[in-house]
């Protein structure tokens, strides 16, 4: 690896961001299966996209159709799954995009490892803190039923622990309030930290 050097391109992140008129950032949505991560991230992306932002949503299920299709669900494979996603997200942020990632990402160590790849201002952890009882009641994929019956092992929240963030930038319980209000809270936060500038904020009003 000592002979492999990072090549500096003539167009850098700042130039790409300026062209797009936005501040690139990664929003990392973490929480139990069924918490509403993908729904919330998707609704936020739609709002941002319609306001003229350049966005991309990385979803836990979708990446396993290609980027991570060779991985299973062992602890080692799940770690590698998130490592790959973190690297892809880093490239996308470098391209000047607003990136949203929706992954259970159950351990603090995994999430902190991804956070460490970004400047402080470019990583926003969103804890989707919907209680286990609500997630299990929703069970959109029937996974909790299978986990309770023993058909699925090492299932986060049932037979494998979920370590809630200690200091997430935002915490949203999707069992409280409606989706529009939850998206509004995200937009207000992004506006406050200047990810959304004043001109584009008007389009999101």
Swiss-Prot record:
Report the transmembrane regions from the record.
Answer: none
Give the EC number: 2.7.1.25
**Keyword annotations:** ATP-binding, Kinase, Nucleotide-binding, Phosphoprotein, Transferase
- Give coiled-coil spans as residue ranges: none
**Reaction it catalyzes:** adenosine 5'-phosphosulfate + ATP = 3'-phosphoadenylyl sulfate + ADP + H(+)
Is GTP-binding one of the keywords? no
User: Which Gene Ontology BP annotations are present?
Assistant: hydrogen sulfide biosynthetic process; sulfate assimilation
Which residues constitute the catalytic centre?
105 (phosphoserine intermediate)
Q: What pathway is this protein said to act in by its record? A: Sulfur metabolism; hydrogen sulfide biosynthesis; sulfite from sulfate: step 2/3
Enzyme class, first EC level, given as a word: transferase
| Gene Ontology molecular function: any one | adenylylsulfate kinase activity
Sites binding ATP sit at: 31-38
The entry's family comment says: Belongs to the APS kinase family.
Give the protein's biological function. Answer: Catalyzes the synthesis of activated sulfate.
What is the name of this protein?
A: Adenylyl-sulfate kinase
- Give the encoding gene's name: cysC
